[in-house]
Amino acid sequence: MTTVSTAAASGPAVPPPRIDPDVPAKVAARNLNFYYGQHHALKNINLSIAANRVTAFIGPSGCGKSTLLRIFNRMYDLYPGQRVEGRVLLDDTDILDPKLDLNLLRARVGMVFQKPTPFPMTIYENIAFGIRLYEKLPKSEMDSRVEKALRDGALWTEVKDKLNASGLSLSGGQQQRLCIARTVAVRPEVILFDEPCSALDPISTAKVEELIDELKTHYTIAIVTHNMQQAARVSDYTSFMYLGEMIEFGPTDKLFTSPSDRRTQDYITGRFG
């Protein structure tokens, strides 16, 4: 993996214009390009993700939306043969700086994946494990942090009497909420959701969507989803991506009711995708 910062060539990093000038940008991408080998997966992406809002990324499979999400916490570093150009700012921190401590970055930018991935340990330890990576707490404080995380994950009342049970013993929906609780336990600033409900039943999906709406009070959220109805329900802003390009980005209500680009209109009305 090679990271190329364009700061020297393009001057100071000036984030793209915000959709809502009254809402500060938490994450901003500027002239972002990403390559898998010779494949140009993301093409000149420019956007600002508003703080304490939910931004959804929609588009057909292979359009680059999950790739973009993984750039925000440098998950792509785990794979060889990839290259990124441009700037991505988390507040004033350049996420693409090769000298950046990735452990600290991933504490600031947490991620919840498509399939629930609880650790093969107790419910309590699923939460405490991540906290211990960054903080050394006495038992009483750790207990309080675990409880708060499980409450934030809307799971506490369901598991408070079985914290020593395996996280793998929970239902699929509970496991996903455990993963969300595990993510918020380390107190991130941004949470990335990559198709978090695709493996869940409608009832579990509704619980996760309700939780996302509650979490944006304290966190900036970006979500990738193939479910356009879900994007319309949970997000404040939506980006439509196609063939590695960001075709349209704006307030969710406007994008779904009066899109500016014909390709967006064709996608949301089911003409392709």
Swiss-Prot record:
Its EC number is 7.3.2.1. It holds the Pfam family ABC_tran. ATP binds at residues 59-66. Disulfide bonds: none annotated. The keyword Transport applies. GO terms for molecular function: ATP binding; ATP hydrolysis activity; ATPase-coupled phosphate ion transmembrane transporter activity. Part of the ABC transporter complex PstSACB involved in phosphate import. Responsible for energy coupling to the transport system. This is Phosphate import ATP-binding protein PstB. It comes from Nitrobacter winogradskyi (strain ATCC 25391 / DSM 10237 / CIP 104748 / NCIMB 11846 / Nb-255). The gene is pstB.
